[in-house]
C-alpha cells in the first residue's frame, strides 16, 4: 500500500527533528540544512522510457560537501479520458549502480483509471556534491495496455524531494531520524486494486532488460551515427551515449510551483 502525501510537502513526513536541532545554529547540530527542491517534471511520450530527473532542482549545494536524498514525493496525472484501461509502473533509478537490483530505489504501480496519483519514496542515502552535480537519478517508466497513437503524451510526472545538505560527514545519526517505509531493501509499492495488465516482473529486471536493449539498438534519429567512418555497421554506442536519447522527455523549464526551503 502506497503512502500518499497530499498538499504541500511536509519535512516532518521524512525527518524527525528535535526542538534543539530546530533552534540551535547549524554548527551545533548534525543537520546543516534541510531543504525542499523545486518541482521537476517529465512528460512521458513512450510506453517504455528511461529519463533523467533533477531531484535537487533549486537546492543550494555545498562545495566539497554532501547531500542526503532523504525522500521524495512523486505526483502523476493521466492525460486520458475517464475509465481507460491499462496502467503504469514507475521506478526511481540511481544510474551510477551497474547492478540493476541495486540501482532500483523504489517502484510504484497504478492503473490508468486512477486519473491522479501520488506516492512517497524514502531513498535515505548521501552522495558527494560532485556526484550530485552530475544528475545521477533517472526514472524508468513502463506503460502497458494504454492504446494511444504515437507522438502524444498519456502521462505527466512531477517530482519534489526533501534533502539534507552538509559540509562534513563526521557526525552520524541522521539516518536513524529518517522515517523508514521499508527496511527490507528496494521498495515495491502498489495500489490495492491494479488493472490486470501488470506482469509479475520486478522493476529491477525491467531495468536490466531496458539497459541491454538500449545499448544494442543505440539512439534513434542520431545525425552523428557513424560519422567519421567510411561505411559498414555503425559503431556501437556506450550506455552514457544511449541515455542522451531520453533527454527530450524532460521539461526542465516547466515548473508548476517553487517549493520552500527551511534551514536549521
UniProtKB/Swiss-Prot annotation:
One Pfam family named in its UniProt record: MP
Stated family: Belongs to the tobamovirus movement protein family.
Species of origin: Tomato mosaic virus (strain S-1) (ToMV)
A single Gene Ontology CC term: host cell plasmodesma
Source species taxonomy: Viruses, Riboviria, Orthornavirae, Kitrinoviricota, Alsuviricetes
Regions crossing the membrane: none
Region (Disordered): 211-264
GO biological process, one term: transport of virus in host, cell to cell
Subcellular localization, as worded in the UniProt entry: Host cytoplasm, Host cytoskeleton; Host cell junction, Host plasmodesma
InterPro entries reported for this sequence: TMV_movement (IPR001022), Viral_movement (IPR028919)
Annotated gene: MP
Compositionally biased spans, kind Basic and acidic residues: 237-247
Protein known as: Movement protein
Keywords associated with the record: Host cell junction, Host cytoplasm, Host cytoskeleton, RNA-binding, Transport, Viral movement protein
Amino acid at each position: 500500500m502506497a503512502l500518499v502525501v497530499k498538499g504541500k510537502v511536509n519535512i516532518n513526513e521524512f525527518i524527525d527533528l528535535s526542538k534543539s536541532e530546530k533552534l540551535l545554529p547549524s554548527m551545533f547540530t548534525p543537520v546543516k540544512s534541510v531543504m525542499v527542491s523545486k518541482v521537476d517534471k517529465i512528460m512521458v511520450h513512450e510506453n517504455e522510457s528511461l529519463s533523467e530527473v533533477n531531484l535537487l532542482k533549486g537546492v543550494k549545494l555545498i562545495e566539497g560537501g554532501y547531500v542526503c536524498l532523504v525522500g521524495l514525493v512523486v505526483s502523476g496525472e493521466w492525460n486520458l479520458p475517464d475509465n481507460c484501461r491499462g496502467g503504469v509502473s514507475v521506478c526511481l533509478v540511481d544510474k551510477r549502480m551497474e547492478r540493476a537490483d541495486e540501482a532500483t530505489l523504489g517502484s510504484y504501480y497504478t492503473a490508468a483509471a486512477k486519473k491522479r496519483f501520488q506516492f512517497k519514496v524514502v531513498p535515505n542515502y548521501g552522495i558527494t556534491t560532485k556526484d550530485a552535480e552530475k544528475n545521477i537519478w533517472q526514472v524508468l517508466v513502463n506503460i502497458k495496455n494504454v492504446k494511444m497513437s504515437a507522438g502524444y503524451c498519456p502521462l505527466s510526472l512531477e517530482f519534489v524531494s526533501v534533502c539534507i545538505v552538509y559540509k562534513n560527514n563526521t557526525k552520524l545519526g541522521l539516518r536513524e531520524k529518517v522515517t523508514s517505509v521499508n527496511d527490507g531493501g528496494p521498495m515495491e509499492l502498489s495500489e490495492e486494486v491494479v488493472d490486470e495488465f501488470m506482469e509479475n516482473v520486478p522493476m529491477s529486471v525491467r531495468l536490466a532488460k531496458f539497459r541491454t536493449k538500449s545499448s544494442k539498438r543505440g539512439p534513434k534519429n542520431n545525425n552523428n551515427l557513424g560519422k567519421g567512418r567510411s561505411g559498414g555497421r555503425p559503431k556501437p554506442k556506450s550506455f552514457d551515449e544511449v541515455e542522451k536519447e531520453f533527454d527530450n522527455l524532460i521539461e526542465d523549464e516547466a515548473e508548476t510551483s517553487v517549493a520552500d526551503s527551511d534551514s536549521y
